[in-house]
Amino acid sequence: MANPERSYLSRFFSSQFSKLPYPSQSFKDAVILVTGGNTGLGLEAARHFVRLQAATVILAVRDLKKGEQAKLSIEESTKVQGVVEVWQVDLEDVRSVQSLAAKASSLPRLDVVVANAGISTNKWALVGDMERTIQVNVLSTFLLILALLPKMQEQDIEGQIRARPRVVVVSSEGHETTAFAERKAARIFDALRDQRQANMDERYDTSKLIQLYLVRALAERLSRSDKPPVTLNAVSPGLCKTGLLRETPLVARLLTGPVMAILARNAEEGSRTLVHAAAANDGETNGKYLRDYLQRLYAAKKATPRRRDCCRSF
């Protein structure tokens, strides 16, 4: 029997050195919203969308000043004006999420949502009554997705269904490494807000595993709906040089520095995976997890009946 850790490491190293095609898919006339669009993967994906003829690209960001700087960077590099908009959202604040969704309801259409924003920290903190990583990466992310779905499912004025809308959740290969001990709890989200049970060193990876469970569960429900179809998928950009580790202790960043220098993709290379996932409008990737442009199954070792309980709790 294959050693799962060796298999994971083999895939990881193979993935990091694979060459990803430069995006060439057309997003002509599309309206696209990217959370965390002011930096890293989100910024570079937004830059591609503008270059690929999107009609509107919304950078949903916490800091409007940084968002405006990102907008200027995109306009300078693409020589395209009047496409990028900057909207505010704070995923630590449910009311901010609801406000963004309400604002989006006034859009003429919404074709693509890239749920890219997230945090990685080993520091325990509560936001309201939930641990901060779970609130941002899971609860607020999927609250926003659910709130945006009605707009994405609208028909156009002529009553014709346009190209199938897409929701892309930015995931991580790290979901395979977490023990996710909370999955054994009677109430999973209660366990996730209990500091005594928390292993913050793997909390980010746990949040990414829960994301995958929710992607699959929501995709299944959407496929059974009588409303216009929406493709919901998840994508791993691989190990990338972004600001994700900004809340990681300095010592840890120094120790991982050589690995990042040798193995990590730059943000533009990683963003190509997001653009590829966003272009998949034929339904084939619905509920799927993508890595290096390939579809993969979810981590089988965690795909127990508790996955259903996790989704039901949400």
Swiss-Prot record:
Domain of life: Eukaryota
Keyword Cytoplasm: no
Pathway where this protein functions: Secondary metabolite biosynthesis
Induction: Expression is positively regulated by the aspercryptin cluser-specific transcription factor atnN.
Cleaved signal peptide residues: none
Keyword line: NADP, Oxidoreductase
The family this protein is said to belong to: Belongs to the short-chain dehydrogenases/reductases (SDR) family.
Function: Short chain dehydrogenase; part of the gene cluster that mediates the biosynthesis of aspercryptins, linear lipopeptides built from six amino acids including 2 highly unusual and nonproteogenic amino acids, 2-amino-octanoic acid (2aoa) and 2-amino-dodecanol (2adol). The core structure of aspercryptins is as follows: Ser/Ala-Thr-Ile/Val-2aoa-Asn-2adol. The first step of aspercryptin biosynthesis is the generation of the fatty acid precursors, octanoic and dodecanoic acids, by the FAS subunits atnF and atnM.
Protein name stated in the entry: Short chain dehydrogenase atnD
Source organism phylogeny: Eukaryota, Fungi, Dikarya, Ascomycota, Pezizomycotina
